Amino acid sequence: MYKKILLFMIALLSFTACSANKEVSETENVSKNEVESKDDNKKNITVTTTFIEDMVHELIGNDKANIELIIPAGEDPHIYVPKPEDFNKLTEADLVLYHGIHFEGKMVDALEGVGYAVTESFDKNDIGEMEDAKDASSMVEDPHFWFDLDLYAEAFTNAANKLKELYADDSQMLALIDENHDRYLKELKDLDKYNGDRIAEIPEGQRYLITPHDAFNYFSRRYDMTVMAPQGVTTDSEVANKDLEDTAQFIADKKIKAIFAESTTNPERMEKLKDIVKSKGFETEVISGHGRELLSDSLADPGEAGDNFIDMYKHNVDLIVDNLK
């Protein structure tokens, strides 16, 4: 374990060496508050993203453990840079859960040393491939698996199994995890039916989803919608003019009446795309603004629409259907 912690310290330092002193002082205050609010009698569980935080909440509730989130709601995991307090969140945890498939970008190497990837059991054939945004001649694995509900259910089961290992000596917690696991899998099946019924409202010739970056290919695969994005699999790459031109031409040719911004990307990119489409003789609408953005790489802030996985998925489907049908 010591070697794993040392490796993480090295990785963390390499990513935060250029951070401002102001940021460090702010995070120190946050860390102090977090320490004061912890219950020493509870297990410490650290998760990287809002998706996995929601899994844990669904399985054991909000008050059965000290649950630490690394990447806050609304931030982009692809480009998130670890902060000093993240070191404590990882090294003090009894269990660390993360996505894997390189979703956590700059934290991947460190996480592999101290945590468990909920995607570890995935069949390679089920993981989608995408064109590498930095090298069009090569392919990369698509990390946005949660839009395939079968894969999400598998990841959820993996998280449940790791929690059962953590609470192996607590029969009440084991029973709770099993009960919540079975309940939630039924809810995912209901969600799948809801999604399919709603998407069927869009005429087949209008089922085109244009988004800033390629987060929805698993969604496309599951619900038979054509998805196009000018940016590629990650959000840390520049958009080539040719990609914008090609996407704009596709929108104009197919007369796609709405294109969508995402909560973790810059909406100005879609406005620029809209202008290029207009120059080609067709006008499309950018669906954006608070509460009108697709949620892709993060759930919404607590208390807002889409702050849990099922509500997030319904929010996206409703937004897509209502603007394309």
Where are the model-predicted features located?
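Sec-dependent N-terminal signal peptides of Gram-positive bacterial secreted proteins and lipoproteins
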Residues: 2-23
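Extracytoplasmic metal-acquisition and chelation regions
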Residues: 18-325
